[in-house]
């Protein structure tokens, strides 16, 4: 809910920006994610009650609460190290399949951005791609199986196509959010073939 507002607002990207985020901005984004997950945990759990275990929101919030406990170490780290630390914390604290999947996305992104104190749009696009690749491999999933990939893959493709077309970072992010929202709506029309939902 309110995906467009929360993501685009916290990024605050302008058309002419070449640097997308530095360490300080990454920490701000993580803070926003933590707050949004906490705010939406009951909604996420309600969704999970329908065809899942009914604990997704609570588990995810527990994981990001744990991330909050290590946040005081982030200012001394590079972006890659921050993302890797978050991934490891999520793997160790989020129950079920979600922890390894979210953790994999962060750890793959961390490996990609190892040593970097700034990232640009090309880094972000590649970060989305390695996250998708990691989740596909870890979850043995592909697009069209009613998973997070049905939002992530269209978002990546839309951002990449838009940014390559005219180099407008803000426009590209807007396109990515729109594609993700459309992907979320698409999942309502298909049958789950992964996870507990596939058994119902």
Give residue spans per PLM region.
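Short, Lys/Arg-enriched N-terminal segments with co-localized hydrophobic residues
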Residues: 1-19
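N-terminal loops that bind phosphate or other acidic moieties
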Residues: 16-200
């Amino acid at each position: 809910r309110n995906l467009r507002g929360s993501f685009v607002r916290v990024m605050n990207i302008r058309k002419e920006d070449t640097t997308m985020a530095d360490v300080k901005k990454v920490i701000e984004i993580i803070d926003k994610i933590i707050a949004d997950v906490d705010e939406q945990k009951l909604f996420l759990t309600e969704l999970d009650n329908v065809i899942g275990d009914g604990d997704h929101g609570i588990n995810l919030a527990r994981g990001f609460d744990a991330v909050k406990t290590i946040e005081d170490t982030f200012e001394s780290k590079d972006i890659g190290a921050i993302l890797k630390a978050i991934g490891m914390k999520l793997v160790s604290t989020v129950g079920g399949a979600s922890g390894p999947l979210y953790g994999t996305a962060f750890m793959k992104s961390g490996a990609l951005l190892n040593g970097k104190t700034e990232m640009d749009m090309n880094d972000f696009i590649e970060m989305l791609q390695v996250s998708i690749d990691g989740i596909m491999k870890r979850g043995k999933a592909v697009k069209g199986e009613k998973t997070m990939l049905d939002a992530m893959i269209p978002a990546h493709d839309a951002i990449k196509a838009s940014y390559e077309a005219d180099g407008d970072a803000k426009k590209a992010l807007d396109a990515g959010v729109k594609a993700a929202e459309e992907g979320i709506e698409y999942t309502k029309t298909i049958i789950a073939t992964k996870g507990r939902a596939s058994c119902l």
